[in-house]
């Protein structure tokens, strides 16, 4: 974030200003800071499905295919 002083005890920047406007512009949310949780979960889910798919593929070809 951009050098804002925090009033919160753990040092976080508040999500909203006192007037209700967002403290960080929407564009900055995509270019600074951690990745959104939905993006991490989607990538992780796709990776898990890929690995499980490899196991199923391996059961039909190769050593375990009878």
From Swiss-Prot:
GO BP term, example: photosynthesis
Lipid bilayer topology: Single-pass membrane protein
Segments of this protein annotated with the region Disordered: 1-27
Keyword field: Membrane, Photosynthesis, Photosystem II, Reaction center, Thylakoid, Transmembrane, Transmembrane helix
Cellular compartments per GO CC: photosystem II reaction center; plasma membrane-derived thylakoid membrane
Top-rank taxon: Bacteria
Localization terms from the record: Cellular thylakoid membrane
Parts of the chain that traverse the membrane: 37-57
Gene3D superfamilies: 6.10.250.2070
Entries under InterPro entries matching the protein: PSII_PsbJ, PSII_PsbJ_sf
Stated role: One of the components of the core complex of photosystem II (PSII). PSII is a light-driven water:plastoquinone oxidoreductase that uses light energy to abstract electrons from H(2)O, generating O(2) and a proton gradient subsequently used for ATP formation. It consists of a core antenna complex that captures photons, and an electron transfer chain that converts photonic excitation into a charge separation.
Family under the similarity heading: Belongs to the PsbJ family.
Subunit note: PSII is composed of 1 copy each of membrane proteins PsbA, PsbB, PsbC, PsbD, PsbE, PsbF, PsbH, PsbI, PsbJ, PsbK, PsbL, PsbM, PsbT, PsbX, PsbY, PsbZ, Psb30/Ycf12, peripheral proteins PsbO, CyanoQ (PsbQ), PsbU, PsbV and a large number of cofactors. It forms dimeric complexes.
Protein name stated in the entry: Photosystem II reaction center protein J
Lineage per the UniProt record: Bacteria, Bacillati, Cyanobacteriota, Cyanophyceae, Synechococcales
């Amino acid at each position: 974030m951009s050098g804002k002083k925090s009033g919160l005890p753990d040092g976080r920047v508040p999500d909203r200003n006192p007037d209700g406007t967002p403290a960080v512009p929407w564009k900055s949310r995509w270019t600074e800071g951690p990745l959104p949780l939905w993006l991490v979960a989607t990538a992780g889910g796709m990776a898990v499905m890929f690995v499980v798919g490899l196991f199923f593929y391996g059961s039909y070809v190769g050593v375990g295919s009878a």
